[in-house]
């Protein structure tokens, strides 16, 4: 151990996707420790990537010296894709096991994480085993959380099969579970070793789940992605899904440029602050109100995207009331959200409890209620605070304007 100077100590496996260094500076009375971590991984986007999963995994497995895999999926996605994914991974020579959990937001819980820890222990999973999250945003969040906490961190791969997972949940390294008092209150940052996004998987989703993910794409458009809003306006939304067998194909074709654009914008915004230490985050557009709705209804009345859509409409109306957004812009946003079959109004019976959630957020953020508000179709700003009167007026304005925009 050095007594003076600064000594870097490199991670022992510099070939790993997760590299780091530690530097010491000090002497007999103590040390200053500086730790740097570097994570490197690829996000592979394209139709047919699921069929190439084994090929895509080989370099990841080699870098981690991984020798086995555990797929974690849910009872909706598993019957569709678990067999294919198992075959593709088995082709690499790695033994594969599969764990199936109940689908839906209630599985994103510490209780479910505990059950998965128990399963991994019972299956003698070691640090050279990698996990595969096969599913939507809930699976990606949950499996990432289990991966970072089990044995102090094992590798994992996100194979996102839902639009919400593809444009949001699988991207950025945020992992965690919900608490009974709020969404995503338990978790951290732990990047995957690979993200695989095959838009063809969207054809097997219920239309409601596709719509759920579209809300996040609208959010990304509004915070500053020129042209994305217009692409969303042109999306073909069939009322006959899935009876109209061509409808999923048309929608997937329309989403072709939207998925990488949404991912790219999210990563661009995360680049200067990947661990989100700054509370002023444009990516929170619609989420303050949205999380309030989800918590108030115990995560069962609204899908995440539906809650974000209502939150987006509400803060846009607040922005209109403040003179930051034109009524025409508000109407255009309401028109798109409703075209995508997303809800836009805070129900009367939930207005009070959502406001109380915002008040709680104010306490957590040192007395400041930070809200992201659109000022134009591709530009948003962050406002430091609003009043109860402004919130109530916005709820009324959305309720008033929405019928004519539907």
Curated annotation (Swiss-Prot):
Residues that hold Zn(2+) according to the record: 216, 287, 304
Cofactor, free-text remark: Binds 1 divalent metal cation per subunit. Co(2+) is the preferred cofactor.
Molecular function as annotated in GO: 3-dehydroquinate synthase activity; metal ion binding; nucleotide binding
Region (Disordered): 1-21
Keywords associated with the record: Cobalt, Lyase, Metal-binding, NAD, Nucleotide-binding, Zinc
InterPro entries per UniProt: Dehydroquinate_synthase, DHQS/DOIS_N, DHQS_C
Cofactor(s) it depends on: NAD(+); Co(2+); Zn(2+)
Catalyzed reactions: D-sedoheptulose 7-phosphate = 2-epi-valiolone + phosphate
Entries under Pfam families matching the protein: DHQ_synthase (PF01761), DHQS_C (PF24621)
EC number(s) recorded for this UniProt protein: 4.2.3.155
The keyword Lyase is assigned to this record: yes
Residues involved in NAD(+) binding: 105-108, 137-141, 161-162, 174, 183, 201-204
Function of the protein: Catalyzes the conversion of sedoheptulose 7-phosphate to 2-epi-valiolone, which may serve as an alternative precursor for aminocyclitol biosynthesis.
Family recorded in the similarity comment: Belongs to the sugar phosphate cyclases superfamily. EVS family.
Protein name, entry field: 2-epi-valiolone synthase
Organism (species): Stigmatella aurantiaca (strain DW4/3-1)
């Amino acid at each position: 151990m050095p007594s003076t100077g600064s000594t870097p100590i490199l991670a022992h496996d510099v070939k790993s996707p997760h590299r780091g260094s530690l530097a010491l500076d000090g002497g007999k009375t103590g040390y200053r420790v500086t730790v740097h971590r570097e994570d490197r991984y690829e996000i592979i986007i394209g139709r047919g990537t699921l069929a190439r999963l084994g090929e895509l995994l080989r370099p990841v497995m080699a870098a981690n010296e991984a020798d086995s895999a555990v797929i974690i999926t849910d009872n909706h996605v598993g019957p569709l894709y678990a067999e294919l994914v198992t075959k593709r991974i088995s082709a690499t020579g790695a033994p594969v096991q599969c764990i199936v959990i109940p689908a839906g937001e209630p599985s994103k819980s510490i209780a479910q994480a505990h059950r998965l820890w128990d399963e991994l222990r019972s299956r003698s999973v070691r640090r050279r085993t990698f996990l595969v999250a096969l599913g939507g945003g809930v699976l990606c969040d949950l499996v990432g959380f289990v991966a970072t906490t089990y044995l102090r961190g094992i590798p994992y791969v996100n194979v996102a099969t839902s639009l919400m997972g593809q444009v949001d949940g699988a991207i950025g390294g945020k992992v965690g579970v919900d608490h009974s008092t709020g969404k995503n209150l338990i978790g951290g940052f732990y990047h995957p070793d690979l993200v695989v996004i095959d838009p063809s998987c969207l054809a097997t989703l219920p239309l409601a789940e596709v719509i759920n993910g579209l809300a996040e794409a609208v959010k990304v458009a509004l915070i500053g992605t020129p042209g994305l809003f217009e692409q969303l306006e042109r999306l073909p939304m069939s009322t006959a899904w899935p009876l109209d067998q061509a409808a999923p194909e048309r929608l997937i074709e329309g989403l072709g440029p939207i998925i990488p654009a949404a991912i790219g914008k999210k990563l661009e915004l995360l680049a200067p602050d990947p661990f989100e230490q700054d509370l002023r985050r444009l990516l929170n557009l619609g989420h303050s109100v949205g999380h309030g709705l989800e918590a108030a209804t115990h995560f069962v009345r609204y899908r995440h995207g539906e809650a974000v859509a209502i939150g987006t409409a509400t803060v846009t109306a607040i922005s209109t009331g403040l003179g930051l957004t034109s009524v025409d812009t508000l109407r255009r946003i309401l028109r798109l959200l409703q075209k995508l079959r997303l809800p836009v109004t805070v129900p009367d019976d939930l207005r009070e409890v959502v406001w109380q959630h915002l008040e709680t957020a104010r306490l957590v953020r040192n007395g400041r209620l930070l809200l992201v508000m659109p000022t134009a179709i591709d530009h948003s700003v962050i406002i430091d605070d609003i009043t109860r009167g402004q919130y109530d007026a916005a709820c009324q304005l959305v309720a008033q304007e929405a019928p004519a925009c539907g």
